[in-house]
Every structure is written in structure tokens, then in C-alpha cells.
A protein has these predicted regions:
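C-terminal alpha-helix/helix-terminus motif
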Residues: 439, 473-480, 548, 552, ...
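Generic, well-ordered alpha-helical scaffold segments in large soluble proteins
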Residues: 72, 76, 80, 96-100, ...
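Ferredoxin-type iron-sulfur electron-transfer modules in oxidoreductases and energy-metabolism complexes
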Residues: 287-313, 324, 328-457, 493, ...
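Generic N-terminal simple sequence motifs
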Residues: 447, 458-461, 487, 501, ...
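The feature marks the mature, well-folded catalytic cores of soluble enzymes
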Residues: 1-309, 505-508, 512-760
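C-terminal non-catalytic accessory extensions
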Residues: 449-499, 503-514
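Short, contiguous, pocket-lining structural segments
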Residues: 249, 314-318
Length: 760
């Protein structure tokens, strides 16, 4: 199993990957596509900058009282029937997860895409324990089958094109799926093969492992945003669910999601919403796993929290927007960074999370940037990545000096000796000119020699001239010619020039001394500012919460109000008080038409009905899709059931486990509400909605939406929903863009999605 531990430092790795022209072409095409989609959507959202400001403030506020929020989160998860484990590092987290899986005698786990589990190398720990790991995200499956490494935070196989993926599937998937090979490398055909390959594994899985995009302290809820439906499969079907979540993912309140959900999909893939957003807390009777474990991971986060500058990186929501605009990433790819976190955010996260001052790979990352600032311009939580890069570069130099930099001190001493003596300086000019002219007769050099190697790797360096300027002056004017400083027009100017010439050696000595003094001053940290080392550890024993509390005691964060001037804000009471938004969404009478437009843009279809024609409309939709065997919640209103047509309709309370649901053609359910701005329907387990698996396993889903349930935007939706409810947000059929950024509908969730909209 490959991992990043054998990676070369960035300067050497980048040379290797720059030579891979196919990878560069794949990246250039993919990142350009995402940039264009994001740019178009940001132009549409007039309050995007206000959302970014609010998101940064919410994350900073959460970090500033993270110890209290962790305790609140733990209490609420336990109250909902879950179990909470705190892990100080990767080894502790892996022991917890392996222990749970082993205790349940499971030989296989299914996994949702998770950066946190990749960070701790959980797959490797599970395999060592004799447990098979099945990656269920399409891109992660491509990486796993290809024995490759991920190269992007959101699209891990972005460096692969469709032809390469086809070859991987033909070589590694079972013959009953691939047959004699794929007739084409069409992304839809490849995605369908992945669906077939994974379906039986989902249905038989006893244990699943996930991460989370957010953990809500107020309710104890986990939030997972995904596209393919594999996340819903893992979160809903197995008996046991283990979520490994970094402590930096905690946010205070359910209401805060109204900000992050508007930013995440837009920044990650240029979409208004990802097809699926799942929220759950603890365990629920007959709805999802019967056992839930939350592993809260530190692994360097509390140490990062102690750095007043570096802790900005903990705001990150893993959207990868910075990767998509980075000119360095686009040319060298993600593997060159030697970390599960590539790109600009990886260059500031990895060195801080690893806390290893002597790791050459981590040490090189802050220098893997041009500091152009494009990353800071697109970051949805306003992380000033260029500032962090400079900050970490400074810390890297400090550590190198503390380990002893004899070469640098020797160079400074030699420079002082040469600059303090005109005779030595002139001798050096003559020698360097003679050597340079002999070795490089063309007068230019690209030779990668000594300290010039990084400069000359990309530039021609001028060779010292054979005849220095002073020698040329003497030959042109003779030994008796006027000295350079005596070309002044007046006697006073000439006297001043002679004094300057006599003072030159002393000035050179002072310059050399100043250079040595500055080197010592930096090494000793004489500026007086406290700069936490990567190796800083809490000075007292204790768990994760204790480490966080100590970090905040040593480096407190001042509380600040969260500005909320985005569209629809201001309805959450005094705690969220704000001035009225100037970016108001269209009033409610326009919301229905906007919902229809946005929902259909994802590939869903909308049929209109009146209260008296719902059954006929539902029947027509089922007939159109050739769905015959229908399952509905036990409390779905009777007048909504089709009375005409050759349909077999049964209530869900008479259906057995998930395997039985998978055999049904379609499900018909009600909803909690619909969101016009994003074209989303929301299910929260209320009347007529049934268990979560009901809207997941049948290949055709019909959702009945009443006109009064349509709200304008996310803030309106959040105020209507119960924070403690298990929720499923659906924005179109399941989909993937993991193959060359081509959108393919219908992966693991329903491939056909209809809304019957009941007008008032």
C-alpha cells in the first residue's frame, strides 16, 4: 500500500512531476473547468464576500472557545446514544478504530472519502489488522485500485484521464463486471461499473468509517456533504458507524451551516449545492446504524492553535479552491507536495500538523509557492495563505539556524572579509573574471553550481567579466588618471569623494558585521515576539481538551461578533444581531418558479399538481419512468397514492431490511421543505418521509412538495428545521465529476428523481 512517507522534498519532487506532460494536461483542463464554474457562480451570488467574512468569523469564534465546544459536543453526542473517543495523535485514533472493528468481528469496512482518515493512515492500520478496506468514493476507488496516491482534496484522481481510468478498471475489477473490457472510456460507463462493483459491498457491510465536514456542538450532529450517494450508503446501512473527525471541524450552532453550505460546494466544484448533505446525531430506532462512535482527533491541531498566526489554517473547510487557482499546483500536481494535503493549504497545514522540525518534506512546503496571492483571493474562509507561508518560512529558517548553519556563518564571515578590503575585493574580481571567462566562454551560464543552483535552474546567470570595471578605468585613463570619486565638478565635491573613498573599507566592515549580527539576532529570537516551535508540546499531562485549553491559555483569541450581512440573515435573535441585508433574495411569490428552475438544472424533473390531483400526478411520473413496485412511508397521506395503473404499492413498515428496499423500483415520500435558491428538497424524518434508506435505495425517488413548503434561501430553511433532527438534503440525482470533471448522473443514489409540486 503506497503512502507519502517515501516522498522527496518539494524541490526535487517538482522536477520529476514537471516532466509528466500528460498529468500536466489533465490538471490544466480540470482546474480550468472548476475555475470557470466557480467564477460564474460567484458572479451570481451578490453576497459572496459577506458570506466569506461571516465564515471566517464563525471559525475564529469556534477556535477561540474550542475547549468548551468540544465538551458540549461530547455531551450532546452521548445524550443521543453515541460514544465519543478523544485521540491525541494518529496512533491513538487508529487503535480506537481498529479496536471497534475487531470487537465486532468485521473482516471488511466500507469508507466514505475522508481527508482525516487519510492523514492518520487509517487504511494501513486496518490492513495490518487483517481488515479489508473498501473505498467507496469513485475517485478514491480509482486511486485504490490503481495503487496510486490522491493528488487533490476534492477530486483525488484529478491527475488521471478517462483512458487511464478505463485501464485501471479493466485490470483490477472482477471479470463479471468488466467482461471482455469496456467498449468505451465514456465516464458514464465507468461510473456504472463502479456502482455495480460496490453495490453488494454496501448492502452486506457491517461497519462503516466516515469523516465529517462539520460537527455541530449545539446538537451533537455530524454533517457530511457529498455527491455520489456513497456517503449516504455508509452513514445509513451498516450496523456500526465510526466517524473520525478533526477537532477543527467543530462549529458552535446549527444556524452556522447557513453560511458554510452556501460556500462549500461553490468553492469546491462550482455548484450551488452538492447533491447530498446528510446530518445525523447518535443512533435512531430503525433509521441508520445501531451503534455510533465519534473519534475526535487532535494530531497537531492543539499545537497549531498556540500559534497566533499559523492557527488561521484551522479555519480550512477542505474545499480545495486554493488548489484550483494555484499556478504551482497546476504544473506539478498534488503528489509533489508529499502529503495528503496538497497545494497552498497543504503547504501551511502539513508542517504545522506534523510537528516534526527535521522532516525535509514538511520543511520544504512553505517554500513551494510564488506568493502570488491567488489562493487568498478565493479562500471561502479568508485564510491569508501567503502570510502564513512567509511566517512558516521564517520559522523554518529559525529552526535551521538553531541546528547550526556553519555554511551560512562562514559565507557571511568571508563576505565581511572581502568587502572590508579594496585590495581583496579587487583580487576577487580578477580571479572570478578569469575563471568565469575560462569556464563559460559564452558569457552566460545555466550551470547549477553551489548556492546559485536554484537561481540558475530557471534563469541565465551573468558571468563575471574578464576585465573588472576598475581595471578598465585604469586602462582607459592610465595609472595617473583621476580617481573615480574625483570626477566631481568642484574642489569641494572632490574632497568629499576622497573622504568617501577612504571610508569605504570601514563601511564594508560595518556591513559585514551587520550581516552577522542580523543572523545571530534571528537565531536567538531577539525580537521579543513569542514564536511557538513546531515541537512545542503542552507542559502538563492531559487529554485533547486539556491540550486545547492550555493552548488557548497561552495564546488566547479575543471574542468577536459575527457579522451577518448576507442575504436572509438577521432572524436568529440577539446572538446573531446584524443590520438588515442589502442582498435580499426575491420575495416568496417568485420562490416557486426559482425552485423549479434550479431543481431541473441538476437533472431532476418537476410535475405540477393541485391538492386533488396529487395521486394522478404521482401515477403519471411512475408510469413515465416504468416504475412498478413502489414503497412508501407508513404515514404517507392516502390521497397521494396512485389509484390507477399497474402498480404494486406497499408501506415501508411491512418491508424488511435494506436489502429488501434495494429490490423496489421506486419510493414516494413527502418532505420537510424545499429551498428555491439552491433547488434543494429537505427530508427530516417528519410525517410521510420514512427512514433515510427509503429515499436512497430504490432507483427512482418521487418527492411530493407542497407550495407552502418552498422557502427562498438557506437562512429561511435553517430557521424552520429542527437542529436535533436527522436530515437529508437532496439537490438533484446522485452525481459525480471524478472523471475529467464530466458530470455523470446516477452513481450510488437514485438515478431518477422527480418532484410533484402541489400548488396552493
Amino acid at each position: 500500500m503506497r503512502d507519502f512517507r517515501d516522498s522527496l522534498p518539494f524541490p526535487r519532487a517538482s522536477e520529476q512531476f514537471l516532466a509528466d506532460t500528460q498529468m500536466r494536461a489533465n490538471l490544466r483542463k480540470a482546474t480550468a473547468t472548476i475555475r470557470e464554474k466557480r467564477s460564474n457562480l460567484v458572479a451570481e451570488k451578490k453576497d459572496f464576500e459577506e458570506l466569506r467574512t461571516s465564515a471566517a468569523a464563525i471559525k475564529d469564534g469556534a477556535l477561540g472557545r474550542l475547549d468548551a465546544l468540544l465538551e458540549e459536543l461530547e455531551a450532546n453526542v452521548v445524550a443521543a446514544g453515541g460514544q465519543v473517543h478523544f485521540a491525541r495523535d494518529a496512533d491513538e485514533a487508529n487503535r480506537v478504530v481498529v479496536g471497534i472493528v475487531t470487537r465486532h468481528r468485521a473482516s471488511e469496512v466500507v469508507k466514505v472519502k475522508s481527508m482525516t482518515t487519510a492523514e492518520i493512515r487509517l487504511n494501513e492500520a486496518l490492513v495490518r489488522a487483517g481488515i479489508d478496506v473498501v473505498e467507496t468514493d469513485l475517485a478514491e476507488l480509482i486511486v485504490q485500485l490503481g495503487e496510486d496516491l490522491p493528488s487533490h482534496i476534492v477530486v483525488p484522481a484529478i491527475h488521471r484521464n478517462r483512458a487511464e481510468i478505463r485501464r485501471i478498471f479493466e485490470e483490477k475489477m472482477p471479470r463479471e463486471i468488466t467482461g471482455d473490457g469496456f467498449p468505451s472510456d465514456d465516464p458514464a460507463a465507468l461510473a456504472a461499473a463502479a456502482r455495480t462493483h460496490l453495490r453488494s459491498r454496501f448492502l452486506r457491510a457491517r461497519v462503516a468509517v466516515s469523516g465529517a465536514n462539520f460537527a455541530i456542538a449545539e446538537s451533537g450532529s455530524m454533517v457530511v456533504v457529498e455527491s455520489e450517494g456513497n456517503g449516504r450508503m455508509c452513514l445509513t446501512l451498516p450496523e456500526v458507524l465510526i466517524s473520525v473527525v478533526g477537532i477543527d471541524k467543530v462549529i458552535p450552532r446549527f444556524a452556522d451551516l447557513e453560511v458554510f453550505l452556501q460556500l462549500l460546494a461553490c468553492s469546491a466544484t462550482g455548484e450551488r449545492m452538492s447533491p447530498y448533505t446528510s446530518m445525523w446525531r447518535g443512533v435512531s430506532s430503525r433509521d441508520g446504524p445501531s451503534e455510533f462512535h465519534l473519534v475526535l482527533l487532535d494530531n497537531g491541531r492543539s499545537a497549531t492553535l498556540r500559534d497566533p498566526v499559523g492557527r488561521q489554517a484551522l479555519r480550512c473547510i477542505r474545499c480545495a479552491a486554493c488548489l484550483n487557482v494555484c499556478p504551482v499546483y497546476e504544473r506539478v500536481g498534488g503528489h509533489a507536495y508529499g502529503s495528503v494535503y496538497p497545494g497552498p493549504i497543504g503547504a501551511v497545514l502539513t508542517p504545522q500538523l506534523q510537528q516534526v522540525s527535521t522532516d525535509p518534506v514538511a520543511e520544504a512546503l512553505p517554500f513551494a509557492s510564488t506568493l502570488c496571492g491567488a489562493c487568498a483571493e478565493v479562500c471561502p474562509v479568508r485564510i491569508d495563505i501567503p502570510r502564513l507561508l512567509v511566517h512558516l518560512r521564517f520559522k523554518t529558517i529559525e529552526r535551521r539556524e538553531s541546528r547550526g548553519l556553519g555554511a551560512e556563518r562562514a559565507a557571511m564571515t568571508a563576505a565581511a572579509a572581502v568587502l572590508s578590503s579594496p585590495r581583496r575585493f579587487e583580487a576577487l574580481e580578477r580571479v572570478s573574471g578569469w575563471v568565469g571567462g575560462f569556464v563559460f566562454p559564452s558569457g552566460r551560464t545555466r550551470a547549477r553550481l553551489g548556492p546559485l543552483r536554484r537561481w540558475t535552474a530557471a534563469r541565465d546567470a551573468p558571468v563575471p567579466p574578464r576585465q573588472p570595471f576598475r581595471a578598465w578605468w585604469r586602462s582607459a585613463h592610465g595609472n595617473g588618471g583621476a580617481a573615480l570619486g574625483e570626477l566631481a565638478r568642484s574642489p569641494a565635491d572632490a574632497r568629499s569623494a576622497r573622504r568617501s573613498r577612504r571610508a569605504a573599507p570601514r563601511a564594508a566592515q560595518l556591513l559585514g558585521s551587520a550581516m552577522l549580527w542580523w543572523s545571530d539576532r534571528r537565531r536567538q529570537g531577539a525580537s521579543g515576539e513569542h514564536r511557538a516551535s513546531y515541537d512545542d508540546e503542552p507542559s502538563e499531562e492531559g487529554g485533547v481538551v486539556s491540550a486545547v485549553r492550555l493552548a488557548l491559555r497561552d495564546s488566547p483569541m479575543a471574542p468577536a461578533a459575527v457579522p451577518r450581512s448576507y442575504a436572509g440573515a438577521g432572524g436568529w435573535g440577539s446572538e446573531h444581531a446584524t443590520e438588515p441585508s442589502e442582498h435580499a433574495i426575491e420575495p416568496s411569490e417568485h420562490a416557486i418558479e426559482l425552485f423549479v428552475e434550479r431543481f431541473c438544472s441538476y437533472g431532476g424533473e418537476v410535475s405540477r399538481a393541485t391538492p386533488g390531483t396529487v395521486a394522478a400526478a404521482v401515477g403519471a411520473v411512475l408510469e413515465k419512468r416504468s416504475s412498478r413496485w413502489i414503497v412508501v412511508p407508513e404515514d404517507l397521506p392516502e390521497p397521494w397514492l396512485p389509484t390507477k395503473g399497474d402498480f404494486r404499492v406497499e408501506r415501508d413498515d411491512r418491508v424488511g431490511p435494506a436489502l429488501d428496499l434495494d429490490a423496489r423500483d421506486a419510493a414516494v415520500v413527502a418532505c420537510a421543505l424545499a429551498i428555491a435558491e439552491t433547488g434543494t428538497v429537505v427530508l427530516d424524518g417528519g410525517v410521510g418521509q420514512g427512514r433515510r434508506a427509503l429515499s436512497l435505495l430504490p432507483d427512482h425517488l418521487v418527492v411530493v412538495v407542497e407550495a407552502h413548503q418552498v422557502v427562498a434561501g438557506l437562512p429561511d430553511a435553517m430557521r424552520r428545521l429542527r437542529p436535533e433532527s436527522n436530515q437529508t438534503w437532496i439537490s438533484g440525482p446522485s452525481a459525480t465529476v471524478d472523471i475529467e470533471l464530466v458530470r455523470v448522473q446516477g452513481v450510488h443514489g437514485p438515478r431518477k428523481l422527480d418532484v410533484v409540486l402541489v400548488d396552493a
